């Protein structure tokens, strides 16, 4: 599967304006991340790890990762002593979706506490997401949506609408998370493949 994705990426780099190739790439990336990189991570320093019930140490000896990106960040948290405490999917934040107007629950990817070089202790809530799913906002805070497909087939329109809905849902989640963090003394951040250092 990794070989297939690399070949599609190679074709896409030669044809960056091809909507069809881009959609195929996103499809295979979603399959690859969901079906081939889920698993259980066993932290080498479980005393730093907290699970959804607040248990630490020996009671938190396995953690589920849902993408290779999450696995890479788990290894980072586990390795460095500057990360004092961390956990995956330990915080639930209620939010109102822009798509259906209903209340849902957002389970954040990571919680961690770190000691910065200055000695300051900072608490973070972190989301790991592809850059393509990260909404860009204008100066008024409105989402900048991707251009609609030039080929107006129903399939292309559905794919475009789905991508727009993903941006709207993520914006709803992250706005709620930012409010929660301001109220509780946390910092909210979103990491993409660029920050994690993953290349396709």
Model-predicted regions and their roles:
Residues 4, 8, 16-17, 21-200:
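Electrostatic, structured charged patches in enzyme active sites and in nucleic-acid/phosphate-binding
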